[in-house]
């Protein structure tokens, strides 16, 4: 790996998602008739908030079991990775519930997981000359 290549771990969305839980939350959200913005106006291309929250979170969080090489630190073993992945899935399961829309403890857990992934990615690229600009570009595109 050359000096100028960014070291970006795989994101959770690239590996696995709890799709059944996300789908169930989307179906349930679609059936809500009180207090939901969709009750004001029937928009023809409405997307469930549950799916959007799950996808955004999973695209910002590193997968715990990524295999790395060429200057990266080695990923953790499969059992530990699956345990940490389940913890991230639990956050997703909580994020997609309509009742947790403004639940600050759930949002804090999600923010902490995103911050930990960001710190990990920054630590992997600590010696890269253009690390901040390139990491932001790769993350936000």
Region locations from a protein language model:
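S-adenosyl-L-methionine-dependent nucleic acid methyltransferase catalytic domains
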Residues: 1-141
